[in-house]
């Protein structure tokens, strides 16, 4: 990543560098713009070529399932903060194997690469999903409600949460369960 650590970005890079995985998705663009306005140097990853996102200095084509790729990105960026948005998020996605490989193995690859840094990020936000609760008919859900995923996407996100906890002693993890409705 040629732009990192040189020119006018040097001071900014030394202070706050955020890596947003899945920057090309719904939330990535909004978050990138907001963080750039707050003074963060934003670098994103996407499995797709050609993404242009406001606020992002660079977007790197990266498949989180490829440990060498994500390790290279993490080693170059040395993020102070990470927002992990990358996932197969369509509950009707037909390739079930891809759901599990991306949402669990890809997430583990990211956490492993981050844990291997000499200076680990101040915070790593892992996005799970309210789908871990399943088809609850309650109007208001609590984090203490029963976890009962009703599809492969929900199961993969719950498994990702449990896997992420194995890194809790090495990384400052935050796990969020957002709703999209």
Language model regions located:
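N-terminal Rossmann NAD(P)H-binding glycine-rich loop of SDR-like oxidoreductase domains
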Residues: 18-36
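SDR active-site strand-loop-helix element
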Residues: 21, 45, 82-86, 124-129, ...
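N-terminal Rossmann-fold cofactor-binding loop
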Residues: 45-49, 64
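Rossmann-fold cofactor-recognition segment
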Residues: 56-66
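NAD(P)H-binding glycine-rich loop region in Rossmannoid oxidoreductase-like domains
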Residues: 64-102
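Conserved Rossmann-fold NAD(P)-dependent oxidoreductase catalytic core, especially the SDR/UDP-sugar
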Residues: 108-152
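Conserved beta-loop-beta element that borders a ligand/cofactor-binding pocket
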Residues: 129, 161-181
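Active-site helix of classical SDR
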Residues: 156-159
């Amino acid at each position: 990543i040629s732009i990192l650590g040189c020119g006018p970005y040097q001071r900014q890079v030394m202070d706050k560098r955020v890596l947003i995985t899945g920057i090309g998705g719904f939330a990535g663009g909004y978050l990138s713009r907001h963080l750039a306005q707050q003074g963060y140097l934003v670098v994103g990853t996407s499995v797709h070529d050609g993404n242009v996102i406001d606020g992002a200095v660079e977007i790197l084509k990266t498949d989180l399932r490829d440990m060498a790729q994500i390790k290279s990105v993490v080693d170059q960026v040395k993020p102070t903060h990470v927002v992990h948005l990358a996932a197969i998020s369509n509950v009707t996605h037909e390739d079930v194997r891809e759901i599990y490989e991306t949402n669990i193995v890809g997430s583990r690859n990211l956490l492993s690469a981050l844990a291997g840094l000499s200076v680990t990020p101040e915070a790593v936000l892992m996005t799970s999903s309210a789908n871990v609760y399943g088809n609850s008919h309650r109007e208001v859900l609590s984090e203490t409600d029963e976890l009962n995923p009703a599809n492969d996407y929900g199961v993969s996100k719950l498994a990702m949460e449990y896997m992420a906890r194995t890194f809790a002693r090495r990384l400052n993890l935050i796990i969020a369960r957002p709703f999209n409705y």
